[in-house]
Regions:
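Short, acidic (Asp/Glu-rich) active-site segment that either coordinates a divalent metal cofactor
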Residues: 33-37, 44, 48-53, 162-167, ...
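A glycine-rich phosphate-binding loop feature that marks nucleotide/adenosyl-phosphate handling sites
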Residues: 32-37, 97-104, 211-225
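FAD-binding subdomain of flavoenzyme oxidoreductases
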Residues: 57-211
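Soluble FAD-dependent oxygen oxidases
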Residues: 1-24, 113, 164, 170, ...
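C-terminal substrate-recognition/cap domain of FAD-linked oxidoreductases
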Residues: 1, 175, 181-261
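Glycine-rich N-terminal segment of FAD-binding domains in flavoprotein oxidoreductases
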Residues: 1-54
Length: 261
């Protein structure tokens, strides 16, 4: 296992590994269940080294006007949120492995999260990336949306560590929500509940959380006894109250037989 805390050190390290035909596996939080951090690289290499990025864990720069920050890829979810809090900003991206996974891991696996209904996946937050490869550094710039050819960041998103080592990224931030509205809705029929979720998704209400648990999952989650499906529905905003949005959502829920307190 190798540890590096500077980009230049990673550049030198990858150059050394390429010279000796050593496979390098970037390691963030290690929370993936897909085996991507295992040393299963075949017989074509002289060896394998895991490159642990835990020392690249700082928020390097904050742009409060544009609500964005340049963050190192090895920052765990709680680490980056703690550093953003003094600026009264948040990334508000919460995959299930939030405490144990890193910004870089989220980007290269195109992660979703518990509030990924309103802001879908990590893709929506990425403004620019810096990727160290055996052939050099690929660094994109923060630019307005453009239709001029392929977007280089799309090569990095979902790359799973196959193209190089993601060392940092500019990401869009949000103001912490001040207004919230939530409801837990039960359905006697799962497929009717699924139809209701589709209607909610197409309604334009844009809930921040709209998660449907099947009857068995409600038992594992501790929110039911296995006799009903449960829909977790939530809205949040840093700007305005949400009673009207929730009221309309519950009207739609009622049309599909959903029950709530």
């Amino acid at each position: 296992v190798a540890f590096r805390d500077k980009v230049q050190a990673i550049i030198v390290f990858l150059d050394w590994a390429q010279t000796l035909n050593v496979a390098v596996i970037p390691y963030g939080g290690g929370s993936s269940v897909c085996g991507g951090v295992e040393a299963a690289v075949g017989d074509g290499f002289a060896g394998t080294i895991s490159l642990d990025l835990e020392r690249l864990n700082r928020v390097l720069e904050v742009d409060p006007v544009s609500r964005a920050a340049r963050i190192q890829a090895g920052a765990l979810g709680p680490e980056l949120e703690a550093q953003l809090k003094p600026h009264q900003l948040t990334l508000r991206h919460f995959p299930q492995s939030f405490e144990f996974s890193t910004l870089g891991g989220w980007i290269v696996t195109r992660a979703g999260g518990h509030y990924a209904t309103l802001h879908t996946h990590i893709d929506d937050f990425v403004e620019a990336t810096r990727l160290v490869t055996p052939s050099g550094v690929m660094q994109t710039r923060r630019l307005p949306g453009s239709g001029a050819g392929p977007a280089p960041d799309r090569l990095v998103l979902g790359s799973e560590g196959t193209l190089g080592v993601l060392t940092e990224a500019w990401v869009r931030l949000q103001n912490p929500p001040r207004f919230r509205a939530s409801a837990s809705v039960t359905f006697s029929d799962y497929f009717t509940a699924a139809q209701c979720v589709r209607v909610l998704a197409q309604s334009g209400l844009n809930p921040s959380n709209c998660r449907l648990l099947d009857p068995l999952e409600t038992v594992f989650s501790g929110v039911g006894n296995g006799s009903h499906a449960v829909l977790v529905l939530a809205f949040e905003s840093a700007d305005h109250p949400l009673q009207a949005w929730m009221a309309r959502a519950l009207e739609l829920v009622s049309e599909y037989g959903g029950r709530y307190d």
